[in-house]
């Protein structure tokens, strides 16, 4: 599980568009904390701080402690809005997490021991179907990543979610099938040559059938 980061914030009043623009010009980002059967709380956070967290690539799947004055709210980011032209953050929605809360998050998949896969050693290619897997997790036990060991996987193998060891109380949102995360595929050149060979064999078989028919 990832270490919980702290984000400092300040309370703000609901204001006009002009007030919000002034806030942004001062290097602050308007945000809101909602959920857990409590009233929404309007806050402002440092653009520099929230941008640095966002650029880690795992912002949306990490629990944060937001410090507002003398209190701390445990939250997880749920939406980030960007300025459409200059592509900088202009608003963030945080979901407040109560005790024993569960969350749905996208967790990245990491592959290990490529050199121990007979399929890859033979020239196969790791074809990643899902770079992330959507999981339901306790808010205090979100996996940093899912690790898949490629040892022993042959050419043509498929790696399914059942091959991944998930932490306790963590489950995929897709439960009606053993979905594929990756495959060990033959390189295009090998596939092309194999298809050509099959086409030639099929053609030869048809020619032999025609010849047999004429002899009859």
From Swiss-Prot:
Record carries keyword Transcription:
no
SS bond list: none
Xref: Pfam families: Ribosomal_L25p, Ribosomal_TL5_C
Which residue ranges have biased composition labelled Basic and acidic residues? 195-216
Q: Where is this region: Disordered?
A: 1-21, 192-216
Q: State a GO cellular component annotated for this protein.
A: cytosolic large ribosomal subunit
Q: Which GO terms describe its molecular function?
A: 5S rRNA binding; structural constituent of ribosome
Any one biological process term the GO annotation gives: translation
Record keywords, A-Z = Ribonucleoprotein, Ribosomal protein, RNA-binding, rRNA-binding
Protein's job: This is one of the proteins that binds to the 5S RNA in the ribosome where it forms part of the central protuberance.
The cross-references to NCBIfam families, in alphabetical order and at most eight, read: bL25_bact_ctc, PRK05618.1-2, PRK05943.1
Name the family.
Belongs to the bacterial ribosomal protein bL25 family. CTC subfamily.
Quaternary state and partners of this protein?
Part of the 50S ribosomal subunit; part of the 5S rRNA/L5/L18/L25 subcomplex. Contacts the 5S rRNA. Binds to the 5S rRNA independently of L5 and L18.
Q: Please report the name of this protein according to its UniProt entry.
A: Large ribosomal subunit protein bL25
């Amino acid at each position: 599980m990832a270490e919980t980061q702290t984000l400092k914030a300040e309370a703000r009043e609901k204001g006009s568009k002009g007030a919000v623009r002034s806030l942004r010009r001062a290097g602050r980002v308007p945000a809101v904390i909602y959920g857990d059967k409590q009233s929404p709380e309007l806050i402002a956070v440092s653009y520099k701080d929230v941008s640095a967290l966002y650029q880690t690539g795992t912002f949306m799947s990490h629990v944060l402690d937001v410090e507002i004055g003398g209190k701390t709210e445990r939250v997880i980011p749920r939406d980030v809005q960007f300025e459409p032209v200059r592509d900088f953050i202009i608003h963030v929605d945080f979901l407040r997490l109560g005790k024993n809360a569960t969350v749905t998050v996208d967790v990245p998949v990491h592959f290990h021991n490529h050199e121990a896969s007979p399929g890859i050693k033979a020239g196969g290619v790791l074809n990643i179907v899902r770079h992330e897997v959507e999981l339901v997790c306790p808010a205090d036990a979100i996996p940093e990543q899912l690790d898949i060991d490629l040892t022993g996987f042959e050419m043509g193998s498929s790696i399914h979610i059942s091959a991944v060891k998930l932490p306790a109380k963590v489950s995929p949102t897709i439960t009606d099938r053993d979905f594929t995360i990756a495959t060990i595929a033959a390189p295009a050149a090998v596939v092309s040559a194999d298809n050509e060979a099959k086409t030639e064999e099929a053609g030869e078989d048809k020619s032999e059938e025609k010849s047999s028919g004429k002899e009859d």
